[in-house]
Amino acid sequence: MHRTVKRILCGIGVALAILVIAAGGLYLTGYLQVYGLTSGYQYLDREERARIVFSRNKLRDIDETLDRVHREGKILCVNGAELRAALASKPKALVYIFTDGCTSSACLPLSTIGAYAHKIGAEPYYVAIDLTPGLLKRTEPILSIDYTHYGTKWHDSFYEAFIKDLTGRSTDEEHFNLVLFEKGRIVSIFSTEKLLQQP
């Protein structure tokens, strides 16, 4: 009886090891794509990568640059500090930090955020956390986090650093994905859940 159980457990262990090795191999060769672990840049093909523009701390006029990049069908990657500095000249700006393709109730459509921003007299800015092919199909001007600025491709690391640069806060302090600025000063930080609770 013990031998049978031992053989079954050994067989299960071998099967799991083979499965892990196979999944690792598929991931390393690019056949298995897991979004949310890294920036997503490595999953973009050559044409898609050519449509990603890294500002490299040279962002001067956010609206002019974002408009030009958007007309070219590209995405502008920025770091948190330069985005905050660029918003200093804006009377009121609402930054929505989102994950493309998210279906959670915490993720609202960009059109909903845009309508809310206009309702409160703010200019909306959409910042994608990860780079995905779907972002390139969006009709709105899209910003994304410049993971290269933070020296890592790992999602949690560059996201935390971006939030710290943009707001001076840690993602551990509270959950938020909306930041309201007035002339570069943070007026409010809140989540889409709180936005939905407003009358």
Language model features with spans:
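N-terminal targeting signals for export/organelle localization
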Residues: 1-72
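Loop/turn elements at helix/coil->beta-strand transitions in domains of secreted/extracellular proteins
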Residues: 90-94, 120-123, 182-183
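Thioredoxin-like thiol-disulfide oxidoreductase module
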Residues: 132-174
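A short, hydrophobic beta-strand/beta-hairpin element that forms part of a small beta-sheet core
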Residues: 173-191
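Structural microenvironment flanking redox-active thiols in thiol-disulfide oxidoreductases
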Residues: 105-145
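Short acidic, S/G/P-rich loop/turn micro-motifs used as interaction or catalytic elements
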Residues: 99-105, 131-133, 186-187, 194-195
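A short, well-structured juxtamembrane/interface segment
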Residues: 73-85
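Short active-site neighborhood of thiol/selenol oxidoreductases, capturing the structured segment around
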Residues: 83-113
